[in-house]
Amino acid sequence: MASRFPKFSQGLAQDPTTRRIWFGIATAHHFESHDDITEERLYHKIFASHFGQLAIIFLWTSGNLFHVAWQGNFEAWVRDPLHVRPIAHAIWDPHFGQPAIEAFTRGGAPGPVNIAYSGVYQWWYTIGLRTNEDLYAGALFLLFLSVIFLIAGRLHLQPKWRPSVSWFKNAESRLNHHLSGLFGVSSLAWTGHLVHVAIPESRGVHVRWDNFLDVLPHPEGLEPLFTGQWNLYAQNPDSSSHLFGTSQGAGTAILTFLGGFHPQTQSLWLTDMAHHHLAIALVFSIAGHMYRTNFGIGHSMEDILEAHVPPGGLLGRGHKGLYNTINNSLHFQLGLALASLGVITSLVAQHMYSLPPYAFIAQDFTTQAALYTHHQYIAGFIMTGAFAHGAIFLIRDYNPEQNKDNVLARMLEQKEAIISHLSWVSLLLGFHTLGLYVHNDVMLAFGTPEKQILIEPIFAQWIQSAHGKTLYGFDILLSSTSGPSFDAGKSIWLPGWLNAINDNNNSLFSTIGPGDFLVHHAIALGLHTTTLILVKGALDARGSRLMPDKKDFGYSFPCDGPGRGGTCDISAWDAFYLAVFWMLNTIGWVTFYWHWKHITLWQGNVAQFNESSTYLMGWSRDYLWLNSSQLINGYNPFGMNSLSVWAWMFLFGHLVWATGFMFLISWRGYWQELIETLAWAHERTPLANLVRWRDKPVALSIVQARLVGLAHFSVGYIFTYAAFLIASTSGKFG
């Protein structure tokens, strides 16, 4: 007899209902719950899956390069980056006849194509790629890497090549290799690529494998490095009249500290970025030699943590016990990694538009909007995941004996104070912000806009001024034109920085007013409420006043029966589930704010944002309704146009989003009743009843249905806004 799915759980494989299928899929990667799992096998499976993950990433990036080289217009775009629309790939089968073919034949392509809003053209152009051959070479190399990683993953599952558990728990070696090897060496390699390939290419010098040993990246060669005259590498930078990709106005510097942006490309100076990566390489290479491994020198992580008892006794036993707690809990490690990665991803979103690193990307408005929104949503999911795994750690891996009176134990002891503080902050922010918005709405409705409560964000303006923004007239630090720091700034360090801050056409230190003040506090409300739900879920995961034995029920449980009353919706999983709605809501406000602020900046009518963003009807009417007109006109009685696909995606996104409520509102009793009726009808319908199944159909569990509902809500929500964002931006700016 063939073994039934799932092989990893014999108990589940013998389940006579459809629960076997759905629960089998849901727990396929939940290695901890599998029948034959040991600690060693768990580490090996995770290790192998990392190789698989890397293989998929390289295959995906290889596919991007390959399709652009094959079906794109990279070489035409390189000749005129500001006017040629970059093509992502061809559309094989354009439905809806001739109008569709005409609508989607763009960018000089022979047939229907998709336009790229990912910024890959600008990225590849900046790093020195110029021809389709370059793209094909990159695609082949990444494909090769992908295969190597797949083989490596398979290899490390073989008995001879399996690392031991002690290898996985060797924190010092891992830190050293990640700091020096991953960050240090890769940053150094990237500096090398920028200096040897990208910077020469930006000056019209073509460096490839056939000539890279003959072309000096700097006229002085390595002499300044060995004689200590490093300042020579910063002399003679590109001039403000430099035409990117040509020798006109080009300099010879390779490592500079200019600040600001290249006037033509509106992106950071390549020579500044090379300098930055070299500095990062140096710092991380040194950092990767700090921890004690083979030679008995350097720091021991455990010694540091054990010794770190804060003075005054206010934090108890400090970090005692933390080393073994973290090192033996994969969920704790994953929680820390996700928290870090989430913050970094959000920082990427903030920095990619304010300090654009890629040539001409700042003038590709739809790409700017798409990249910001994309990275913020990803950051949101990663950050909520951090708290989810933190809660799982507290339920499954936390040992109170091992952590007596250390900072972790004290967090749990003080959880009521933490949770109640987050609660009052959320209430204060929510009621005050909504109160101000609604007051302003009422004043507008009664025709007395002058009675609005408009608060200038003077503290934020003061901070902007201290960094050099002169508009507000604060005359402080770098905005004081007569001050010594201002004078030094022009000559000694970052001469282009102050110019960039005071250029009102970019997104660096955007001018802010009462509308920004209000939406800032609305976003703060969302952030604090999301944090409240997540922190409460994690801190109460082991037990609460209402349910002291909660940890015995695991991470996700629907209720503990009717007898105890009030135990529904209080598992740590439920907190994560609720927090995701708040996270999406918050990022909605963040992206609305970013997008509206920027489309008015790009269109040259910032007054619209400034005047309409101080009341809710302004947001609904002048942002959402006004900018959805492109979607509403995606197709009309006269046929379709190039925005039609976004109009359909907008509708489809709403459909997926609304489907989520079907799972969220009606619970399993309703579905079980419906299933029984449908099964009865099926068995009595000719022809249909020729199809039989072995598993008895049962409804999803409450927790499963919530997950399915949440997934539809999230996907639909993001699809809807993505279509709105891309259509409204590309409809205005092409």
Swiss-Prot record:
Name of the gene encoding the protein in the UniProt record: psaB
Q: Which GO terms describe its cellular component?
A: chloroplast thylakoid membrane; photosystem I
Q: What is this protein called?
A: Photosystem I P700 chlorophyll a apoprotein A2
What lineage does UniProt assign to this protein's organism?
Eukaryota, Viridiplantae, Streptophyta, Embryophyta, Tracheophyta
MF terms in GO: 4 iron, 4 sulfur cluster binding; chlorophyll binding; electron transfer activity; magnesium ion binding; oxidoreductase activity
Q: Does the keyword Plastid apply?
A: yes
Which top-rank group of organisms is this from? Eukaryota
Location within or outside the cell: Plastid, Chloroplast thylakoid membrane
- Is ATP-binding found in the keyword set? no
Q: Which reaction does it catalyse?
A: reduced [plastocyanin] + hnu + oxidized [2Fe-2S]-[ferredoxin] = oxidized [plastocyanin] + reduced [2Fe-2S]-[ferredoxin]
Organism for this UniProt entry: Pinus thunbergii
| Residues bound to chlorophyll a B1 | 654
Q: Which HAMAP family match?
A: PSI_PsaB
Membrane topology reported for the UniProt record: Multi-pass membrane protein
List positions binding [4Fe-4S] cluster. 559, 568
Membrane-crossing residues?
A: 46-69, 135-158, 175-199, 273-291, 330-353, 369-395, 417-439, 517-535, 575-596, 643-665, 707-727
Which key words are in the record?
Answer: 4Fe-4S, Chlorophyll, Chloroplast, Chromophore, Electron transport, Iron, Iron-sulfur, Magnesium, Membrane, Metal-binding, Oxidoreductase, Photosynthesis, Photosystem I, Plastid, Thylakoid, Transmembrane, Transmembrane helix, Transport
Q: According to the UniProt record, what class of enzyme is this?
A: oxidoreductase
